[in-house]
Amino acid sequence: DNIYFQATGGGVCFGGGEPTMNADFIIEFAKLIPKGWKLTLETSLKCSYKTIESLAPYVAEWIVDIKDTNKTIYEKYTGVSSEIIQQLCYIKELVQVDKVIVKVPHIPNFNTNEDVKHSIEILKGIGITHIKEITYMEHITHITK
């Protein structure tokens, strides 16, 4: 695998759920992988500043799903409060801004096109340069008898 990853610039991505909850494991894993492998974290940043700081030296790329910058929309969708803007500003102090990709989803029944545009403007205003506007895909379950 090492030859393949070295040749392609590949690596490992931790995502699903909230990977920052396993920060200690990710750090130990990062210490074991061959030099040159890219470690990516796909996260909602629902973690402490200390966790962000501990992961920063090991994570080559941060993919951050913000849901929405509007705190009311965020809380209605997730059920928890948000410090996402403050956390993104903190990450920018620790890593190069081009290593941070922020996903802004259109979430049916939670945010509007205007909400998404507003979130993108806020992100640009704090200096985020890699912004991906995405369409939220609801999982469809088919039950057969």
Indicate residue ranges for each PLM-predicted region:
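Conserved AdoMet/S-adenosylmethionine-binding subsite of the radical SAM
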Residues: N2-H139
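Binuclear metal-ion centers of metallo-dependent hydrolases, dominated by the metallo-beta-lactamase
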Residues: I143-K145
